[in-house]
Each structure stands twice: as structure tokens, then as C-alpha cells.
Amino acid sequence: MKVGVPSHGDFIAGLSVAGLLLPEAVAYAGIAGLSPARAIFAAIMGCLAYVLIGRSRFAVVSPTSSSAAILAAALAALHGSANDPGQIATLVVLISGICFVAASTLRLGALTGFISRPVLRGFAFGLAITIVVKQLPTIVGVPVPTGNLFDLLIGLGIAFPRWSMPSIALGSAALALLLALRRIPKLPGALVVLALGVGVSAAVRLPGVTLVGPINMTLTQPALPPYSWELYSRVVQFTLPLVLILFAESWGTMRALALRHGDSLVAGRELGALGLANLASAAVSGMPVGAGFSVGNASEGAGAASRATAVAAALGLVLLIAATGPLVARLPAPVLAAVVVAALIHALDPAPIVELWRLRRDVVVALSAAIAVLAFGVLNGMLIAIVLSLAALLRRFATPHVARLGRLGTSHDYVDIQRHPEAVAPSDVVIWRAAEPLFFANAERVLTAITTGSGDCRLVIVSLEESADLDSTALEALIEFDASAAKRGVRVQLARAHDRVRDLLTRAGADELAARTSFSVDDAVDAVRGAATP
């Protein structure tokens, strides 16, 4: 798919997206505590760089709420008296770009699998609450010392007598208007609200309402902090989770939109495209960039037909900032905070977590991820969420259901007799199947359960259809299980064993057990009965 010359539809879609990019860029820069110019330059360069090798026609690579929040957490942890936050931010973006390119070169696109969708949903939910709460001081018009979420809420409560009613009224009105304008998808509601906010501040004196102030759009030469092993190593520690979340978020957006329209994408190529976009952002002292969900859906809704939409969006953003840049100085800060809150409304929807509860799958993991972000901060919360996700997966694999199988009618199919009472288990043979692959954490437990459940039966079949491979622990446990069964006069037959498993048994010296394998359960039943016949 070539970038091509922007069509009329792409140009219109690009302008519509640019109308969303400008307020979001200014808002996300505020989340990170950086100049809006950094986010604007990042959005321009991200869009232009991505289309060079990226393949998603709907992706608009620009600063995202999650990347801004993670960057803010990193800057808060790394910023010291001798460290310039702008330089640290540039270093974070540069290392992010390098990590993306390295991951693409090493074909590590599958790494996003370490962040399950429930974890990502819980993380996004907790992150959205965190960002929204941090906008409250701006909306109520009182400065509150930054700290963890609970300290901020306590500070807001203490400062209640000093809350500014004009600021609250303006922020609330802006948020209500933003939500109302969502009923007109092709109208850039955020841009309309920002324009109205500028108009109100110019026409009416607003006591107690803070203004954004002038934006310096001068392009400066990027600078990195002086080299220090301690600083640079800590930056890498913060950057790796940022890269993981950025790609998980971006790939989720790209893939969902691609599947919706029958497009095909390659994870490795998109990793490289995101790497190039972040390197381009670092070259202009920008912020981390990725393909955000809200902007990607806005691009689709505006009628984007090719990647040229992103080019048109970048050019539209240049025109917008040239025409309206001086006016942004008059923008009331509560209006900008309302734009941030409105941009995160979709992430505050509990419906995906409620659906997990309804399905009784992974809801604890999702809620734990959200609570971890709220209690321990963005970065620590994300790491805790990933660990919880892996722990939940390990627990499920370590305690699999071991089903006893029976024949379904006169067919050759063998199914779980607990789930299918109509299935008939053979009277002279017990057939077992673990619901998960055998590996070091469950092999002993599964084989012990089979031994216990088989009772006095002398013919035992173990179906290994879920085990495409075995680690050394599972291999040894299987051989020991067979040897123990033989001492008790029990004959073991393996069904549906994969070629790799048979090869492993042979290499381990268990040739006789490797020979007692069948391609189907039905064949295994015939084989074990035949061997038992004198």
C-alpha cells in the first residue's frame, strides 16, 4: 500500500484529525509537565515518519495519554537539581525509538503477549482515573502539591474553601459541551470548545481562572543530559515499560482497525515504524509517540482511505498552529483540563471489566491492574499488573483440569464424561487428558491425579494432545510415571503424542514408551487392549 497523493477524502479526514491532535497535544504535554511545543512537534514528526514504513491506513502516530502519564512518572522520579526534565524527556524518546527498532530487527513483536487484554484494560482504567484526578486542581483553580493520588485528593479537600467557582463553572461547561458535540462525529468538538474558551477569556474577565500562556514554537536543537551511568541506566529501566505499553496500545489499535476493514499488518514492521517515529520525535525534542485509540478511530470515522491521511493531518496541524498559535495563550486552563478528561471518557467505561466479570474470566487480574496503578503509581502499577498476569497464567496452567474421557455414541470421538454424560467410558480402560500442556509446574500434579483416579485399573491411556513439547521436568515425570505403573502391573499407552514428544522420549532412552504411542485415542484403546490380550 503506497502513501500516494492525498485524495480529497484524505485531505478532509486529515484536517478533521488535526483538529483533534492540536488540543490533545497541548493536553498531553500538560500531563507530562512539558511545553506544548514538544507534543505538537512530536505529533507532526510522528505522523510524517510513520507513513514511510508503517502500513496502517488509520494509525495517527502522536503523543498518547498513557505515554504522557508514564513519561510524567519517569520525569518525577529522575528529575533532580542537576537534571533538566526536557533533556531527560528527549533521552527517554531517543531510547524508546532505539528499543522499537531493535525489537523490530530481532522480531520481538510477540512481546506484547506479555500484557494480556484484561491487564491492558485494567491498566487503562486505572491510568484514566489517575489522569482525570490530576486534572481536578486545574478545574477547581487551586494549586495542590503533586504526589500520589490519595495525597492529591486530601490536598484538594483541605483546599476546598479556596476553590474557584468561575474556574469550576468554565471547566464543567466545557466538559458538558465536549460530550454533547460527540453526537456530531465529523465535527472537531475539542477544537470548537478550545476556540470558544479563547473567545470567552478574551471577552469576559475571569477572576481565579488560570490561562495556558504563550507557546514558544521555536525549534531548538535536541540536547541530552550529561552522561552518567546511574542516570542513563535508570532511564532505560523506565523506558522499557513505556515501550511495552506503547506498542501494546498501538498494536491493539492498529490491529483492531485493520481487522475491521480486512487489512493485513506485520507486527515487526509496525515496531520499526514506531521506532522511526520516536527517533524523529527525539530529533525535534518531542515526546514519546504511538498510535492512540481515540485518534485512530477519529481517522477511521472521518473517512481516511490511505496513509496519506496522516500526512494531511501533519500538514493540517502545521496550518492550525500557524493560524491559532498566538490565541492558545488566551486559553483557560480549566477548558484544557476538560479536553483531557473528555479524551479519556472511553477509558473510564467499566463495561469491558464488567464483561470480564460476566464471563468469570480474568476480572481479578483486570481489577488488580487498575488498583495497582492507583495505589503504586503508573510505572510500578504496570509492572505489578504484568507480574499478576503472568502469575494468573502460571496458576491456570499449574492446576489444569484432568478429564476422564469416554466414547461419544458409536463415533471415534472421546470426550470429557463430566461435560458429556451421554459419553460412555470403557470398563476395562481409563483414558485421561489434561486440559493444559504438561510442564515443570504441573507434570507431577497431573500424573499423580491420573494414578489416583485410575484405581485398580490395569490399562491406562494418557492423551497428550495439549502437549506439543515437553520440558525436562515433564519428560522425566512422564518416564517415572510409566516406570512406576509398570511395577504395579499397569500398562500405559500414550495417545495423540506429537512427533517432538516421541523424539524426546527416544533421545531420553525411553524407546519402549515411545513405541507405545498412538495417533488417536481410538487407536490407543485398540493398542492397549491388544497388548493386554495373552
Per-region residue spans from a language model:
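Transmembrane helical cores of multi-pass ion-transport proteins
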Residues: 1-411, 509
